[in-house]
């Protein structure tokens, strides 16, 4: 089922979500399916549960090819509960980001280039992966959504913040 995506300005996006405690449950599997369906319908590359007004530390992400980010390499489709992120170096990389909760806008955001993320699959099995580049960016962006942070709070140069159909995408 496609869920409504709440937008910036809704205070529910600014809360720290509590951990998922019902790993392996039918309810969680249904929620994950709804999140993937919602993300795909919105042409997104990631979605956090708080974006559909579900107060849980749960994110989904991944794609083979993205209409919104055509240059991005594929990212494995993943449902990740109770995520933790560890930078693997201090290397930062600037890149364009948008958000399904902030439709029509984008900005250049600095993110760690190399990370390790950990958490749990919906069935309760552990997940631990190293990621770099756009994959790392997507995970960090969705993690921010779990801790009440939206990408505009990370903008360093507001000259790069604007509407998708107006911006020049030269970095």
From Swiss-Prot:
Entry keywords, A to Z: Hydrolase, Iron, Metal-binding, Protein biosynthesis
Q: How is the cofactor bound?
A: Binds 1 Fe(2+) ion.
Swiss-Prot/TrEMBL catalytic activity: N-terminal N-formyl-L-methionyl-[peptide] + H2O = N-terminal L-methionyl-[peptide] + formate
Is-annotated flag, keyword Coiled coil? Answer: no
Top-level EC class as recorded in UniProt: hydrolase
Cofactor(s) for this protein? Fe(2+)
Residue positions binding Fe cation: 99, 141
Family, per entry: Belongs to the polypeptide deformylase family.
Q: What does this protein do?
A: Removes the formyl group from the N-terminal Met of newly synthesized proteins. Requires at least a dipeptide for an efficient rate of reaction. N-terminal L-methionine is a prerequisite for activity but the enzyme has broad specificity at other positions.
What protein am I looking at?
Peptide deformylase 1
Species this chain originates from: Xanthomonas axonopodis pv. citri (strain 306)
């Amino acid at each position: 089922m496609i869920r409504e995506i709440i937008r910036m300005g809704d205070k529910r996006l600014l809360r720290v979500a509590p951990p998922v405690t019902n790993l392996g449950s039918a309810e969680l599997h249904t929620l994950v399916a709804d999140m993937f369906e919602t993300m795909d319908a919105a042409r997104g590359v990631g979605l956090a549960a708080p974006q559909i007004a579900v107060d849980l530390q749960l994110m989904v992400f991944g794609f083979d090819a993205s209409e919104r980010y055509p240059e991005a390499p594929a990212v494995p489709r993943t449902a990740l509960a109770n995520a933790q992120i560890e930078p693997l170096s201090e290397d930062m990389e600037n890149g364009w980001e948008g958000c399904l909760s902030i439709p029509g806008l984008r900005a250049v955001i600095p993110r760690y280039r190399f990370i390790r993320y950990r958490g749990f699959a919906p069935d309760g099995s552990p997940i631990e992966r190293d990621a770099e580049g756009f994959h790392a960016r997507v995970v960090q962006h969705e993690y921010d959504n779990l801790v009440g942070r939206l990408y505009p709070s990370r903008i360093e140069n507001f000259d790069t913040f604007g509407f998708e159909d107006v911006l020049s995408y030269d970095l």
